[in-house]
């Protein structure tokens, strides 16, 4: 019997437990390894006996501070020869929003104009260089779940939001207005092992549409253009499992973010068993 281990910071997400259930239905053993457990210690001789690791962790903000602990933990497991799906290079890419934007833009995928900034002066320089108007978006490059993402509507707000930018990995980004009839509706498409599983639109009165913030979903009809876009993103990021977040406008689709550990609640809400698709892929790779 193959064994798959899911790495999770605290195990609060229902997606983690739903995925474990689907893996076990396929006859594989599945453990959830909680990085927050007081019983665990990553020492020099620590080993994790498993056939495959699926990490729900990366570099990110937890409790308003940037932590590298989960990333160092993953790197230590790599030294032991552990196999990961998604690959570690994909985990790093999707954790770093700026690197991700750079890769997409280099490969002719439309993204909002974005800059990595050190301070307020960099932010002003960016606005002037691209002749942008307010509002603009300020976000932390390693933020999660829509947290630490803000809108600056004028220079005073911009100055406040760019304090300590160089220490916090802050980005400034062109604001893409994707509002429809007073509501913001972006898109999340899931790709698993080269197949588009499905997608939904996240509906919000705020430009931050993350489900973590309490927003709702509606089913997305995926046309050929969207399917090709999602598959290209998965190919570029070398991802087996990927959530592709897209801002739709009248004329274009803008890819805003890639997620290598996408939540599956939104898919369950529209009747798609994404956990089963992910579980099938993980079991295949664990057996290979």
From Swiss-Prot:
Record: residues binding Mn(2+) 2 = 257, 259
Q: How is the cofactor bound?
A: Binds 2 manganese ions per subunit.
Q: Where is the ATP-grasp domain?
A: 101-287
Give the required cofactors: Mn(2+)
* Enzyme superclass (EC): ligase
GO CC terms on record?
cytoplasm
A Pfam family it matches: RimK
Q: Which reaction does it catalyse?
A: oxidized coenzyme F420-2 + L-glutamate + ATP = oxidized coenzyme alpha-F420-3 + ADP + phosphate + H(+)
For this UniProt record, give its keywords in alphabetical order, as a comma-separated list.
Answer: ATP-binding, Ligase, Manganese, Metal-binding, Nucleotide-binding
Q: Which GO terms describe its biological process?
A: protein modification process
Q: Does the keyword Transmembrane helix apply?
A: no
- State where Mn(2+) 1 binds: 245, 257
Its assembly, as annotated, is: Monomer.
Question: Cross-referenced PANTHER family, in alphabetical order?
Answer: COENZYME GAMMA-F420-2:ALPHA-L-GLUTAMATE LIGASE (PTHR21621:SF2), RIBOSOMAL PROTEIN S6 MODIFICATION PROTEIN (PTHR21621)
The record's comment on protein family reads: Belongs to the RimK family. CofF subfamily.
Please report the name of this protein according to its UniProt entry: Coenzyme gamma-F420-2:alpha-L-glutamate ligase
Q: Which organism is it from?
A: Methanocaldococcus jannaschii (strain ATCC 43067 / DSM 2661 / JAL-1 / JCM 10045 / NBRC 100440)
